Regions:
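Two-component system phosphorelay core
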Residues: 1-112
């Protein structure tokens, strides 16, 4: 079950994330659920597989903002690294970072 404690156990900074949601746990958890289902993950993967660094950057950058605002640090870190790599138009190493992201995303989704 997706709970504040379960998120914290996976490394999310729930105190910070909750603070951004005025300590409204139900609202925060609803936003986290929405973030876990965001279509940006699929857009990012499709763009990387197609070698489209610009589209991949746009998807990664959008995810970075969402995940950062919710303080979902284990997801934010690989997305942030991907964003900076793609900002420079580079794709080397991006599939490895995507693999890390997908692995962590699976852990978070398994909480539901």
């Amino acid at each position: 079950m997706l709970t504040i404690q379960a998120l914290a156990n996976l490394g999310a900074d729930t105190r910070e994330g909750l603070g951004r949601c005025l300590n409204n746990e139900a609202f925060y958890l609803r936003l986290v659920n929405m973030a876990l289902d965001d279509g940006g993950y699929d857009k990012l993967e499709s763009a990387l597989n197609a070698g489209d660094a610009q589209s991949a950057f746009e998807a990664a950058h959008a995810l970075k903002g969402v995940l950062g605002n919710l303080s979902l640090t284990p997801l934010y870190t690989p997305v942030s690294e991907l964003t900076e790599l793609l900002r420079q138009g580079k794709t080397e190493g991006s599939l490895e970072l995507l693999g890390q992201l997908k692995s962590v995303l699976s852990e978070f989704r398994a909480l539901r």
